């Protein structure tokens, strides 16, 4: 038993053997706790400012993810031309600035829905470059054999931090009542404390990014940015494994992967939850996602679980639609998180291991485009369908979103890859230790 447990541990966390990746992973974990605490506080703030409007939540989500829809392809060409360290430090400084602005305006009581939307748009612009750059840098610090594990551990970090950050939101907001709101639980300034803590969390990852020894990489010859974008698009169109995985991720992101709208609306409006229960329900989703990432971290062939993750995600979303209250919603949301992360880690690893390195920035930006860029239309679709003022209401609106996702899965079922075909002459970059 102990030998099996030890083998599982070594297999599941193999990428953390590499010290540079380990430093980055730990700093990112700390920073993301602050980011998730801010994201949860921002959702709650929007609902408070708008009187519980699902449409307002949808509009802010559109503002946050619209830049990925508009800029992802351009961002990929930039990432393949510019050193990744420079891109990442720049994006982190922009995100630090927007977090500071949100903290100060909320504390002073001058925050407005329009200001939140503007800051969400600026943050989204930074994330349009940050997300594909972070995904691309996985191959800089781990050998090829550990790439699937590193992708899974990145998702684990994302969801451990989601669980901690969302659970801390209720506690920190309660502290904010006494520290920032003069004991008044209805003053919006209580919500500034999560934003201030997020500001502090950026400094760890900035220090690590400034001191990590990024390996040299071949930038190569480039034409115009438009030519580079077209080259990436041609590659995806000509590579069925990558094309079909991206189609599935994009279609599910448009329909059912809209939990940044679904969870806060169900928690605050449908179930009537206050800060503590709101944070608990959000954290339950993160616990399930964390379990999905851990499960995927020990799998040598990530392509096998694309279908499994999608089925679990869709079935649990339907179950959430018929859940009567927050107590039963927590395990259902955990199942949603497990299914979503099983799908997304499988998809990301499959794409990362299939593409050549000279196209990595462009292809991963296209992946970000279909995952995050579908957020704006998906958020509008979700907020329209699940809103109490909408044509279907929360229950049948969510069932409809799940059914649309199910149609997409059935259409692509036979075309999804079952194993990974690596690019020709795949090799580890200079400076990365071999397995």
Where would I find each of the regions flagged by the language model?
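Short, membrane-interfacial amphipathic segments enriched in basic
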Residues: 1-16, 216-227
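Helix-loop boundary and gating motifs at the non-cytosolic
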Residues: 5-66, 235-285
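Helix-boundary and loop/linker segments of multi-pass membrane transporters
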Residues: 13-19, 106-110, 187, 233-239, ...
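Substrate-agnostic recognition of the 12-TM MFS/MFS-like secondary transporter fold
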Residues: 22-40, 61-79, 83-98, 115-174, ...
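Hydrophobic/aromatic positions within or immediately flanking transmembrane alpha-helices
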Residues: 25, 41, 58-61, 88-89, ...
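Transmembrane alpha-helix termini and helix-breaking/packing motifs in multi-pass membrane transporters
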Residues: 44-50, 103-108, 164-195, 269-270, ...
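C-terminal transmembrane bundle of multi-pass solute transporters/carriers
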Residues: 69-74, 81, 85-97, 101, ...
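Helix-loop junctions on the cytosolic side of multi-pass membrane transporters
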Residues: 109, 136, 140, 189-191, ...
């Amino acid at each position: 038993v102990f030998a099996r447990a030890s083998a599982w541990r070594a297999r599941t966390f193999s990428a953390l053997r590499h010290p540079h990746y380990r430093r980055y992973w730990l700093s990112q974990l700390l920073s993301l706790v602050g980011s998730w605490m801010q994201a949860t506080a921002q959702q709650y703030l929007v609902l408070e400012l708008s009187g519980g409007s699902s449409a307002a939540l949808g509009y802010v989500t559109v503002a946050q993810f619209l830049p990925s829809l508009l800029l992802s392809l351009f961002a990929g060409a930039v990432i393949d031309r510019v050193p990744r360290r420079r891109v990442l430090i720049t994006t982190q400084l922009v995100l630090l600035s927007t977090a500071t602005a949100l903290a100060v305006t909320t504390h002073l009581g001058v925050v407005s829905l329009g200001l939140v939307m503007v800051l969400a748009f600026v943050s989204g612009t930074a994330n349009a470059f940050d997300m594909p750059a972070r995904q691309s840098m996985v191959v800089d610090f781990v050998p090829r054999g550990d790439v699937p594990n590193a992708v899974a551990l990145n998702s684990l970090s994302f969801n451990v931090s989601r669980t901690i950050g969302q659970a801390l939101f209720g506690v920190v907001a309660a502290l904010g009542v006494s520290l920032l709101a003069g004991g008044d639980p209805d003053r919006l300034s209580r919500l500034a404390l999560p934003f201030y803590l997020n500001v502090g969390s950026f400094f760890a990852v900035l220090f690590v990014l400034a001191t990590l020894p990024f390996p040299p990489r071949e930038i190569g010859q480039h034409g115009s940015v438009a030519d580079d974008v077209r080259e990436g698009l041609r590659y995806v169109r000509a590579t069925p494994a990558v094309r079909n995985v991206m189609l599935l991720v994009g279609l599910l992101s448009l329909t059912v992967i809209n939990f940044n709208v679904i969870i806060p609306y169900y928690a605050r409006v449908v179930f009537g939850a206050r800060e503590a229960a709101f944070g608990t329900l959000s954290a339950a989703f993160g616990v399930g996602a964390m379990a999905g990432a851990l499960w995927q971290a020990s799998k040598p062939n990530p392509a096998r679980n694309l279908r499994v993750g999608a089925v679990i995600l869709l079935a649990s979303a339907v179950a959430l639609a018929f859940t009567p209250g927050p107590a039963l919603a927590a395990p259902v949301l955990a199942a949603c998180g497990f299914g979503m992360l099983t799908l997304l880690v499988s998809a990301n690893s499959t794409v990362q291991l299939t593409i050549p390195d000279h196209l990595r920035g462009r292809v991963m930006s296209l992946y970000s485009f279909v995952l995050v860029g579908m957020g704006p239309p998906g958020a509008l679709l979700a907020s329209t369908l699940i809103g109490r003022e909408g044509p279907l209401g929360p229950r049948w609106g969510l069932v409809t979103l799940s059914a649309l996702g199910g149609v997409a899965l059935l259409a692509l079922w036979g075309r999804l890859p079952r194993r990974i075909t690596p690019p020709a002459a795949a090799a580890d970059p200079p400076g990365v230790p071999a397995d």
